Regions:
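Sec-dependent bacterial lipoprotein signal peptides
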Residues: 1-17
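Ser/Thr-rich, Pro/Gly/Ala-heavy low-complexity intrinsically disordered linkers and tails
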Residues: 19-87
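Beta-strand-centric surfaces of beta-sandwich/beta-rich domains
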Residues: 82-398
């Protein structure tokens, strides 16, 4: 995947809004009173109850282990003309990895990450991801990464911090002890040989004794000959907001179109620590639309729900997504757009496939930041993408 258009759009954000906005520091990640932790976790789980989640100490779900065969190979795939598939293709191979282990005292809360290389010698097609979360897990996020150096020892990290630059693409977010995300039949993400992945684990020890944090992740692949369409991502949002200190705020409704050929099979929203909601609707601009996100699932910024669609959402000419983001700025400084933990974001990403395959797409609503750019800027579609590429190639000048 060519990440340059994505990075170009991030540069555009930086040029428009800068990256030096101030805000209050992130709250401490360690709670001094374990009893407070237990109360908070129970409240969250009782309120959320997303897809039957009971926390990492709940009863294990029954999941069949897919067969582990040899590498699926790198045969050429025709993703231009997907056909209806009557049966789900068999799993060709499974690639396992994990994050862990580290010890946690009662009441301790922390987020750690690893960067690891999978052992696929050839290009493979991933159609499902299974996670198995250990005791005390709050949630785990799995990314496809463009990094080249492994960091196999867990290190402290902050959720989603590196998604905007294009180096990490979220593939799965889960808070359930055992869960499998399956793409539609014959739809798969392409993994390059020895694909790098990033695993982010948020752990919370609400037990009276020490625990050992650990989570397993498995990627299930299908043969290249069974791939009918390549899965990819739509990354949509706006940097047009300035959240007043000590106040609630929302962006108002924005609209971004979607290719007519796209079939969206899952969607999730994204903010930073002050975010209270990302609302998304499906339909034509300036007409009545259907609410599709988050529906009856509560939105938590660090464990945003993933809504799946079966059948997938379809789009006619002029249709797309209408969305708005909301925040509660409990700090004492205004907060604007940025990638740091002390700034905010308003984004959502959608998993899709199409005929022909159109690849990764990122769209923004510039809003009042720079009205001359129009209602939306999309890369790689917009002429501005090539201008920014020229800017980069020129070392910061045209």
């Amino acid at each position: 995947m060519n990440l340059l258009p994505f990075s170009c759009c991030f540069l555009l954000f930086s040029l428009l809004v800068g990256c030096d906005a101030e805000s209050t520091p992130v709250a401490s990640s360690v709670s001094p009173d374990p009893n407070d932790i237990i109360t908070d976790v129970s409240s969250v789980l009782d309120t959320a109850n997303v897809d039957g989640a009971d926390g990492a100490d709940g009863p294990d779900s029954e999941t069949a282990d897919p067969p582990k065969d040899e590498d699926a190979g790198s045969a050429a795939v025709d993703t231009d003309n997907p056909e209806d598939i009557s049966t789900r293709p068999p799993v060709a191979a499974t690639y396992d990895t994990f994050i862990g282990d580290w010890d946690m005292q009662p009441g301790q809360e922390i987020t750690k990450c690893v960067l690891k290389r999978l052992e696929n010698e050839n290009e493979v097609w991933v159609t499902g991801i299974t996670t198995d979360l250990g005791q005390g897990s709050h949630h785990v996020i799995v990314y496809r990464s463009a990094e080249t150096e492994e960091k196999t020892e867990p290190f402290d990290c902050f959720p989603f911090l590196e998604t905007l630059g294009g180096n990490t693409i979220p593939l799965m977010i889960t808070q359930i002890p055992q869960e499998t995300l399956e793409f539609p039949d014959g739809v798969a993400f392409k993994f390059e040989p020895n694909q790098m992945v990033r695993i982010e684990a948020h752990y919370l020890n609400y037990y009276p004794e020490d625990i050992t944090a650990h989570a397993d992740v498995s990627f299930h692949t299908i043969d290249a000959a069974d791939v009918e369409a390549e899965a990819n991502m739509l990354f949509y949002g706006t940097p047009d907001f300035n959240i007043p200190a000590g106040e609630t705020y929302d962006t108002g409704w924005f609209f971004l179109d979607v290719w007519k050929e796209a079939k969206v099979f899952a969607i999730t929203g994204h903010t930073h620590q002050y975010g209270t909601n990302v609302e998304i609707k499906h339909g034509l601009q300036n007409e009545d639309k259907i609410d599709i996100y988050p529906l009856d699932k509560p939105f938590y910024w660090d464990e945003a729900p993933l809504i799946q669609f079966d059948p997938p959402l379809s789009f006619e000419n002029g249709e797309g997504f209408e969305y708005r983001c909301s925040w509660n700025n409990t700090g004492d400084k205004n907060v604007t757009f940025g990638e740091s933990a002390n700034q905010e974001m308003c984004f959502f990403w959608a998993y899709y496939y199409s005929a022909p395959s159109k690849g990764y797409r990122m769209c923004i609503n510039p809003g009042d930041i720079y009205t001359q750019l129009g209602d939306q800027v999309c890369c790689p579609d917009n002429f501005l993408c090539s201008l920014i590429e020229e800017y980069l190639a020129g070392g910061g000048s045209f």
